[in-house]
């Protein structure tokens, strides 16, 4: 806070000049900071610290800059938020100029990311909630893309920037520090790696379709309740390299074809092949009729059983909640995977299908799995009856009943045969070469050709897809590096020098002057330092993870020792009781013998 105050004089003058600019109409109120009562820090945004506060007897969120380098992002967010007014975009109440801060609507439900992957207890949510969140997100982004005279592109769509209110039923987009006006040429790399469109970090020109790619990743994330590309691990540029090579999140078993087609179209390598946000809104609005109950508040579990504590929270409602009780037996027969030796989608062996069908029918009603920050390969084995994602086969049947789309054939999936719901081109899953293992841990990425199919032989319930693209195509970059610069075949440090994109705003290198060798040299040095920084941070994270594992093992050992000690004491106590009972038994036996002898004497005398 003190840093923000120190920077307020210069920041307020720039903000004041921007406010007074006659060419811009900004709809916000200049607020006196004395009217604000700060309560607590709740997080960080694209810039600055976000605090909960009271202003005019209502809860608000204030965002303050911490350094001079964040002033530009502050002005961007102030300018963009002052232009928008939509129920699915966080409302700007006003701004303070001394110290510099934004006063915005407070979201009591926190971010969607925390709802999906936060600390326990995690809330239950249904398929209707997941679809509603994505619909509301698309409505907000479609509004940004359709603004006049200049449309807006968010460029940083991800669950941490999606806030929930009204019991988790209403979603609001926030964090416009990276937003910009839609232009013909935009090469500034903004956003986060897991949700970032490939054309953004490749340095080529990109458009509003980069938001569509991010939305498609979010759709996958809320359905599976798993972090995208989490199985890759390591620094963020590993994700970038995998996405650049065509890797996408694994398809979801039993996902209705219209939803799967929409999702995979959003992941297309070619931005022109992705649907517009307006089209997404129309499709999602149509599909929402099959998902009632989105207006019910999220429910948090009061307590967990032993199993619940080990497996984290799950969703009470899934796509299977709308289906009949025998859906799991029926749906598992349609499970598909991509073999490691070719690109044809085949059925699993009948024995595996029968076993999984039996196990899943015994497991009862399954639901959205909770995130544990784990990869696809860390899912529970099939013998536990757990699925990676929700069962949506009955919803698919309902959609089929009303739209009468043709049944998909075996082999390559026909993603465009959905009647009148989706009039889209066919998504081609290509691949002529043999996929090979790379050194990136827990991930099978594509080979040297971007169009090859990537598969995960140890995950029969999912199939990894890649989008096709010209194999000779090389991305245009805004700096002198290209993927061909890499001499490391292990996909490590030199694979893709874009690590600085995921650093905090104040740590990212400034764009160099292409005509200055010194500027380019400084930029290259800064990027290498950023790469080294990311490597060190990764090592720290791995060491911390190992530390947590050791602490957990130590706790388990202590519990085992306590249990052993308790068992020894119980055994000793039982031995004492046994000895006491034996003594008592002998006494009773002697007394019985005495009584019998006395009775015999009496009978003899009589």
Curated annotation (Swiss-Prot):
Activated by pro-inflammatory cytokines and in response to physical and chemical stresses, including osmotic stress, oxidative stress, arsenic and ultraviolet light irradiation. Activated by 'Lys-63'-linked polyubiquitination and by autophosphorylation. Association with TAB1/MAP3K7IP1 and TAB2/MAP3K7IP2 promotes activation through autophosphorylation, whereas PPM1B/PP2CB, PP2A and PPP6C dephosphorylation leads to inactivation. Ceramides are also able to activate MAP3K7/TAK1. There is a cross-link at residues 72, 158, 209 (Glycyl lysine isopeptide (Lys-Gly) (interchain with G-Cter in ubiquitin)). The keyword Nucleotide-binding applies. Residues 36-291 form the Protein kinase domain. Residues 361-375, 453-463 have a biased composition (Low complexity). It is a peripheral membrane protein. InterPro entries: Kinase-like_dom_sf (IPR011009), MAP3K7 (IPR049637), Prot_kinase_dom (IPR000719), Protein_kinase_ATP_BS (IPR017441), Ser-Thr/Tyr_kinase_cat_dom (IPR001245), Ser/Thr_kinase_AS (IPR008271). Association with TAB1/MAP3K7IP1 promotes autophosphorylation at Ser-192 and subsequent activation. Association with TAB2/MAP3K7IP2, itself associated with free unanchored Lys-63 polyubiquitin chain, promotes autophosphorylation and subsequent activation of MAP3K7. Dephosphorylation at Ser-192 by PPM1B/PP2CB and at Thr-187 by PP2A and PPP6C leads to inactivation. One of its GO terms (molecular function) is MAP kinase activity. It is an enzyme of class 2 (transferase). Its cofactor is Mg(2+). It is found in: Cytoplasm; Cell membrane. One of its GO terms (cellular component) is plasma membrane. The active site is at residue 156. PROSITE patterns: PROTEIN_KINASE_ATP, PROTEIN_KINASE_DOM, PROTEIN_KINASE_ST. Residues 306-338, 443-452, 464-473 have a biased composition (Polar residues). It catalyses: L-seryl-[protein] + ATP = O-phospho-L-seryl-[protein] + ADP + H(+); L-threonyl-[protein] + ATP = O-phospho-L-threonyl-[protein] + ADP + H(+). Its EC number is 2.7.11.25. Its main location: cytoplasm. Residues 1-300 are annotated as: Interaction with MAPK8IP1. ATP binds at residues 42-50, 63. Keywords: Apoptosis, ATP-binding, Cell membrane, Cytoplasm, Isopeptide bond, Kinase, Magnesium, Membrane, Metal-binding, Nucleotide-binding, Phosphoprotein, Serine/threonine-protein kinase, Stress response, Transcription, Transcription regulation, Transferase, Ubl conjugation. Serine/threonine kinase which acts as an essential component of the MAP kinase signal transduction pathway. Plays an important role in the cascades of cellular responses evoked by changes in the environment. Mediates signal transduction of TRAF6, various cytokines including interleukin-1 (IL-1), transforming growth factor-beta (TGFB), TGFB-related factors like BMP2 and BMP4, toll-like receptors (TLR), tumor necrosis factor receptor CD40 and B-cell receptor (BCR). Belongs to the protein kinase superfamily. STE Ser/Thr protein kinase family. MAP kinase kinase kinase subfamily. PANTHER family: MITOGEN-ACTIVATED PROTEIN KINASE KINASE KINASE 7. This is Mitogen-activated protein kinase kinase kinase 7. The gene is MAP3K7.
């Amino acid at each position: 806070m003190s840093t923000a105050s120190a920077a307020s004089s210069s920041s307020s003058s720039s903000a004041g000049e921007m406010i007074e600019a006659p060419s811009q109409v900004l709809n916000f109120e200049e607020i006196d900071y004395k009217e604000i009562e700060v309560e607590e820090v709740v997080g960080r945004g694209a810039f600055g610290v976000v605090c909960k506060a009271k202003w005019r007897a209502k809860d608000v969120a204030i965002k303050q800059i911490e350094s001079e380098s964040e002033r530009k992002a502050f002005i961007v967010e102030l300018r963009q938020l002052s232009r928008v007014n939509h129920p699915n975009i966080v409302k700007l109440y006003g701004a303070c100029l001394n110290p510099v801060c934004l006063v915005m609507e407070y979201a009591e439900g926190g971010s969607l990311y925390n709802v999906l992957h936060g600390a326990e207890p995690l809330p239950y949510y249904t398929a209707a909630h997941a679809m509603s969140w994505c619909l509301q997100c698309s409505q907000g982004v479609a509004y940004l893309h359709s603004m006049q005279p200049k449309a807006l592109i968010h460029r940083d769509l991800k669950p941490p920037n999606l806030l929930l209110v009204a019991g988790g039923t209403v979603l609001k987009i926030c964090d416009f520090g990276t937003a910009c006006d839609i232009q013909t040429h935009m090469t500034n790399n903004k956003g986060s790696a897991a949700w970032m469109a490939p054309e953004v970090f490749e340095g080529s020109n990109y458009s509003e379709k980069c938001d569509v790619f991010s939305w498609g990743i979010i759709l996958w994330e809320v359905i599976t309740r798993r972090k995208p590309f989490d199985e890759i691990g390591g620094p963020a540029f590993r994700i970038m390299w995998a996405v650049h090579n065509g890797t996408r999140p694994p398809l979801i078993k039993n996902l209705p074809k219209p939803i799967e087609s929409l999702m995979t179209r959003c992941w297309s390598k070619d931005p022109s092949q992705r649907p517009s946000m307006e089209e997404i809104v129309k499709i999602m609005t149509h599909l929402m009729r099959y998902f009632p109950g989105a207006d019910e508040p999220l429910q948090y579990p009061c307590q967990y059983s032993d199993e619940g504590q080990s497996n984290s929270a799950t969703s009470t409602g899934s796509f299977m909640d709308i289906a009949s009780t025998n859906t799991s037996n029926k749906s598992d027969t349609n499970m598909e995977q991509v073999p490691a030796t070719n690109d044809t989608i085949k059925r699993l062996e009948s024995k595996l299908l029968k076993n999984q069908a039996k196990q899943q029918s015994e497991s009862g009603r399954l639901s959205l799995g909770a995130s544990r920050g784990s990869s696809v390969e860390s899912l529970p084995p099939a013998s536990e009856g757990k699925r990676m994602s929700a069962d949506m086969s009955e919803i698919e049947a309902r959609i089929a009943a009303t739209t009468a789309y043709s049944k998909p054939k075996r082999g390559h999936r026909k993603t465009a045969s959905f009647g009148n719901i989706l009039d889209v081109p066919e998504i081609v899953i290509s691949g002529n070469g043999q996929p090979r293992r790379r050194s990136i841990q827990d991930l099978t990425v594509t080979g040297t050709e971007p169009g090859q199919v990537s598969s995960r032989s140890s995950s029969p319930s999912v199939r990894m897809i890649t989008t096709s693209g010209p194999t000779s195509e090389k991305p245009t970059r805004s700096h002198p590096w290209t993927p061909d610069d890499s001499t490391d075949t292990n996909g490590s440090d030199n694979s893709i020098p874009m690590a600085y994109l995921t650093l905090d705003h104040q740590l990212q290198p400034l764009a160099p002057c292409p005509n200055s060798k010194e500027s380019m040299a400084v930029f290259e040095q800064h990027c290498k330092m950023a790469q080294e920084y990311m490597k060190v941070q990764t090592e720290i994270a791995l060491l911390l993870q190992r530390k947590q594992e050791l602490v957990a093992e130590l706790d388990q050992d202590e519990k085992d020792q306590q249990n052993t000690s308790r068992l020894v004491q119980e055994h000793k106590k039982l031995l004492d009781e046994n000895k006491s009972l034996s003594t008592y038994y002998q006494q009773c036996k002697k007394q019985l013998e005495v009584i019998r002898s006395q009775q015999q004497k009496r009978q003899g005398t009589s």
